[in-house]
From Swiss-Prot:
It is found in: Cytoplasm. PANTHER family: DNA REPLICATION AND REPAIR PROTEIN RECF. It comes from the Bacteria. The keyword DNA damage applies. ATP binds at residues 31-38. Pfam families: SMC_N. Keywords: ATP-binding, Cytoplasm, DNA damage, DNA repair, DNA replication, DNA-binding, Nucleotide-binding, SOS response. GO terms for biological process: DNA replication; DNA synthesis involved in DNA repair; double-strand break repair; SOS response. This is DNA replication and repair protein RecF. GO terms for molecular function: ATP binding; single-stranded DNA binding. The RecF protein is involved in DNA metabolism; it is required for DNA replication and normal SOS inducibility. RecF binds preferentially to single-stranded, linear DNA. It also seems to bind ATP.
């Protein structure tokens, strides 16, 4: 079971110097607003993805009066352990795994798979299609070797095709034909992988949602819309839509326009589920990713939850904690109020109190 055994955070927002040994199971961080709870999660997020969920300007995360920030963790996993560290300051962003410099931020994500939930996680349902594509592609990134490179090849080719569409050159027709072939090759590979992974995720989402909702619910079904008509090949529709694409200046069809729809009893979950049920459904989507990762590679991921009690009553929190322990995930979850007796019945749980940038274990 992969988990962080030691965490060292320095000069990260209001967290001056935090060192702790978290539980390999669930870690609850309670404290008032602006105490540093979300900054704690953000630091782990930075360690796992090389970016923040709050800002694109990391300089704003450096504590006032300091030159740099640093986050280091010792990570235990099957077969050994490693040390991961990130630093940002005058020299820019630097990351290491053990003593090796990390050249691509995707290497961090491979070594420390993360899932993140917050009060804004409804965006996977309410937001545009790209959020549902991101949900699908998370599993492909962690389970399909080469998917990350394949996706970037597609993105670069899409950018080149769009450029040719906008720039009127004498040779544009020849160039567009070449880009159409490349784009369709990459695009159909991505689509095939997405369809296969969605099939694997669907049953897990349905089972997890039923377990968390704790009430009779029709099975969850999903519809994958690949981004162009299924009756034709991608290259064919790229050729057919060329005049429209050229007038519009962008590519209308392809996996960058794909969509996933979620249904319960044949109805869109956004219409049939209450707000609280939708939150439970969002947890089911995230946990299905973790479950598939473990079943496929016997690899755990770390789950970050901001505002754990938001839109969840005590019964739902109890079932969620039980399920998180059962799945063997390391969890860092924030709350305003201490959960106290609510967590005593669960094994492998530690609670920490966060106040004015200081984190202390509650005994």
């Amino acid at each position: 079971m992969m988990h962080i055994t030691h965490l060292d955070i320095r000069n990260f927002r209001n967290l001056k110097h935090i060192e702790l040994h978290p539980s390999k199971g669930v870690n609850i961080l309670s404290g008032a607003n602006s105490s540093g709870k979300t900054s704690f999660l953000e630091a782990i997020y930075l360690l796992g993805l090389g970016r923040s969920f709050r800002t694109v300007q990391l300089i704003s995360a450096i504590q006032a009066g300091m030159e740099s920030l640093r986050v280091v963790a010792k990570v235990k996993q099957v077969g050994g352990s490693h040390t991961a560290g990130v630093e940002f300051g005058p020299a820019g962003f630097r990351a290491r795994i053990n003593k090796d410099t990390v050249k691509k931020r995707s290497q961090l994500a491979t070594q420390l798979p993360l899932l993140y939930m917050s009060s804004y996680s409804h965006v996977v349902l309410d937001g545009g299609p790209r959020y549902r594509r991101q949900w699908l592609d998370w599993s492909l990134f962690h389970l399909e070797p080469g998917f990350h490179d394949l996706w970037w090849c597609y993105q670069r080719t899409l950018k080149q095709r769009n450029h040719v569409l906008r720039v009127h050159k004498p040779s544009w027709q020849q160039e567009i034909n070449a880009w159409n072939k490349k784009l369709s090759t990459y695009g159909e590979q991505i689509t095939s992988l997405r369809e296969a992974i969605l099939f694997k995720l669907q049953d897990s989402v349905s089972q997890l949602f039923t377990a968390l909702a704790h009430q009779p619910i029709s099975p969850v079904t999903m519809e994958f819309k690949q981004g162009w008509a299924r009756t034709v090949r991608l290259e064919e529709i790229l050729n057919e839509s060329l005049n429209y694409d050229r007038a519009a200046g962008y590519t209308r069809y392809g996996p960058h326009r794909a969509e996933v729809a979620f249904y319960v009893d044949g109805k869109d979950v956004r219409e049939i589920l209450s707000r609280g049920q939708q939150k439970v459904f969002c947890y089911s989507l995230a946990l299905s990713q973790a479950n598939l990762l473990y079943r496929t590679k016997e690899q755990n991921c770390i789950f970050l939850i901001d505002d754990f009690t938001s839109e969840l009553d005590a019964d739902h929190r109890k079932r969620l904690l039980t399920l998180l322990n059962k799945l063997g995930m390391q969890v860092f979850a924030t709350t305003i109020e201490s959960l106290g007796s609510e967590i005593k019945a669960h094994p492998n749980i530690k609670e920490f109190h966060v106040k004015l940038g200081q984190v202390e274990e509650m005994v």
